From Swiss-Prot:
CDD domains: cpPDZ_EcRseP-like, S2P-M50_PDZ_RseP-like. Its cofactor is Zn(2+). The lineage of its organism: Bacteria, Pseudomonadati, Pseudomonadota, Alphaproteobacteria, Hyphomicrobiales. Keywords: Cell inner membrane, Cell membrane, Hydrolase, Membrane, Metal-binding, Metalloprotease, Protease, Transmembrane, Transmembrane helix, Zinc. One of its GO terms (cellular component) is plasma membrane. Residues 133-208 form the PDZ domain. The chain crosses the membrane at residues 39-61, 122-144, 305-327, 355-377. It comes from Brucella suis biovar 1 (strain 1330). This is Putative zinc metalloprotease BR1156/BS1330_I1152.
Length: 379
């Protein structure tokens, strides 16, 4: 009996050690996403019937003075805002019966609004996820600054791509693929996502500029949360003495600026990853689903609250970007319909939307099944 209780309630138990950290991170990210939809909808004069964290039967809730039902539902793996006139939680316009709405509700219904209001409301969810990531990074930069090193090579691994390309200790990176380099981390950021690509480097050597080419090879590393990650590397390193390791501190505005830059880098790396993944150049095990996220949440929580919040930032931008994929019922799929409507001056036909919703739903479910299979069996 005691062993059973420890399994679920001990500090390293399934409940306290894994489920609670996972639900904490996921709930905050989902709440911010749905709050983005809700707030912009309110600003646009759109009425909301329900704001739910989770799906399925309601566990608890209340109705506010605007008639919106705020609730916590039984299945805590997501959430939704149901607007006036919605037939489902996905805000699909297919099957909407406007004749059943009162005149007042028709004015506040989602699907009767101008296309720009609908697009703004839909885009707000992913946008708020990105804003959450920027906000978290801003706080971390303000509190802890950033550890940097000069882009100087202290050593070249024998037989590595860098050795074959002619890199030498003492070389200073000036640019990679035309992008200016100011820190050693800049080189790592660019190279890590370009395994197998021939990259152009410019280094400063004895006061002269030298152009080199190298093809990063895949190396497997273990990140701070214990995940096996595959990255591109050319086989150079720096040291504290050569790289002049130091910490830069930032003021409030500088922290926000650095957070925006860091978030932009993550968006760029994510886009590059999926382009390479689509043509079979990335490892499928780099994609994970709820089981992997729960495992990461557990490991992050065991290392401290700061780690859990950093994971929240990464999950938030991941969910934001995923929702911008141009597939219904994701937000990006809605935005495609609104873009077509804005161009042609009339909505996409109900029949066409129904077809795309079914195709999109199957693709989204297939992707979810794929990452879950990775979690449980393949990786």
């Amino acid at each position: 009996m005691q062993e059973a209780l420890a399994l679920f309630f001990g500090s390293e138990s399934l409940l306290v050690g894994t489920i609670i950290p996972f639900l904490f991170v996921l709930t905050v990210v989902v709440f911010v996403h749905e709050m983005g939809h809700y707030l912009v909808a309110r600003w646009c004069g759109i009425g909301a019937q329900a704001f739910s964290i989770g799906f399925g039967p309601e566990l608890l809730g209340f109705t506010d003075r605007h008639g919106t039902r705020w609730k916590l539902s039984a299945i805590p793996l997501g959430g939704y805002v149901k607007f006036i006139g919605d037939e489902s939680e996905t805000s699909s316009p297919v099957g909407v019966n406007e004749s059943a709405l009162s005149e007042e509700d028709r004015k506040r219904a989602f699907h009767t609004q101008p296309v720009w209001k609908r697009a703004a409301t839909v885009f707000a969810g992913p946008a708020f996820n990105i804003i959450l990531t920027i906000a978290i990074f801003s706080v971390f930069f303000a509190l802890y600054g950033r550890q940097i090193a000069d882009p100087l090579i202290a050593g070249v691994q024998p037989g590595s791509p860098a050795a074959e390309a002619g890199f030498e200790p003492g070389d200073r990176f000036v640019s990679v693929e035309g992008e200016k380099i100011t820190t050693f981390a800049d080189v790592q950021r660019i190279v890590s996502g370009r395994a197998g690509d021939k990259l152009n480097f410019t280094v400063e050597r004895d006061g002269k500029m030298v152009d080199l080419q190298a093809v990063p090879k895949i190396v497997e590393r273990t990140d701070p949360l214990g995940n096996k990650v595959k990255l591109g590397a050319i086989g150079v390193e720096t040291t504290e003495a050569v790289g002049n390791f130091r910490r830069i501190e930032y003021g409030p505005l500088e922290s926000v600026g650095q957070a925006v830059i860091e978030t932009g880098h993550i968006i760029g790396r994510t886009g590059e990853f999926f382009k390479r993944f689509a043509v079979g150049r990335e490892d499928k095990c780099q994609l994970g689903g709820p089981v992997k996220i729960a495992t990461m949440a557990s490991k992050a929580a065991s290392q401290g609250f700061d780690w859990l919040i950093q994971l929240m930032a990464m999950l938030s931008i991941g969910i934001g970007l995923l929702n911008l994929f141009p597939l219904p019922p994701l937000d990006g799929g809605h935005l495609v319909f609104y873009a077509v409507e804005a161009i042609k001056g009339s909505p996409v036909s109900g029949a066409a939307q129904e077809i795309f919703y079914r195709i999109g739903f199957l693709l989204v479910m297939g992707f979810m099944g794929f990452v879950l299979f990775n979690d449980l069996f393949a990786c």
